[in-house]
């Protein structure tokens, strides 16, 4: 199998610490340039984990359409500015950042007080302008995730604490382009040269982004290396196909889905280990959510969970 190599031929960092990198990957067999380029592009834009501010609590404010005395921006504008802040978290757990500024002042992300596990990438990001005597005091929730996360009005953990939610953009890669050229290797022209242009928000270098995307693709395809011909499986080892269905197929509400995920319930097979009583013991999982899961299993798959806990043999 022919080997290829890659090279970073151009890189730069802008004033806001966003970064750009240009990579050449060659030689690839004819047609593989498009295959590799498209797969990497999709993963770079959708699957890399990033960090974002997901909610904000501002002293004296209880809704996003309010104004703050002595602050030029209204609350909605402040939230939009907070949405643009670029962070990098080294912790898997949500973190809380704080800000308290007295006017007169121009407030930027440089004023943030964040945990040691969190790095502010662009400290010049503008937040608000304060007049003399005014005070802007807030707390904000920092989370890791992938893709785009819309406001979830059902989240009790933030709603009950007066946090105003923000549509979070976790994507660390802002843009990806790729082109295919002929690779002139020796006398053969039947090979591809893949050229990739990657722009990031600064929380990843383009090199790290490309490396992580390749790792995700490798882990995705790794199980396919061990595919066994179904004809070779002994008849006594058949598996109920419905048990392998992911819980996403049940089309549950966001609240019920998130509770199941936090409890490490990822498939119907995992759910079958629970009785109806067991569901109610899941953290933040109420009667309404339990009924929703029970109904979805019955209507979509014809599966009925036992009412009571099943005694396990010792």
Swiss-Prot record:
Q: Give the span(s) annotated as Alpha N-terminal domain (alpha-NTD).
A: 1-228
Extent of the signal sequence? none
Q: Keywords in UniProt for this one?
A: DNA-directed RNA polymerase, Nucleotidyltransferase, Transcription, Transferase
A cellular component term from Gene Ontology for this protein is: cytoplasm
Write out the GO MF terms: DNA binding; DNA-directed RNA polymerase activity; protein dimerization activity
Top-level taxon of the source organism: Bacteria
This enzyme's EC code(s): 2.7.7.6
Record-linked InterPro entries = DNA-dir_RNA_pol_insert, DNA-dir_RNA_pol_RpoA/D/Rpb3, DNA-dir_RpoA, RBP11-like, RNAP_asu_C, RNApol_insert_sf
Q: Which GO terms describe its biological process?
A: DNA-templated transcription
Spans annotated as Alpha C-terminal domain (alpha-CTD): 240-314
Q: What this chain does, per the record?
A: DNA-dependent RNA polymerase catalyzes the transcription of DNA into RNA using the four ribonucleoside triphosphates as substrates.
Record text about domains: The N-terminal domain is essential for RNAP assembly and basal transcription, whereas the C-terminal domain is involved in interaction with transcriptional regulators and with upstream promoter elements.
**Subunit structure of this chain's protein:** In cyanobacteria the RNAP catalytic core is composed of 2 alpha, 1 beta, 1 beta', 1 gamma and 1 omega subunit. When a sigma factor is associated with the core the holoenzyme is formed, which can initiate transcription.
Family the UniProt entry places it in: Belongs to the RNA polymerase alpha chain family.
Give the protein name, as stated in the record.
DNA-directed RNA polymerase subunit alpha
Record lineage? Bacteria, Bacillati, Cyanobacteriota, Cyanophyceae, Oscillatoriophycideae
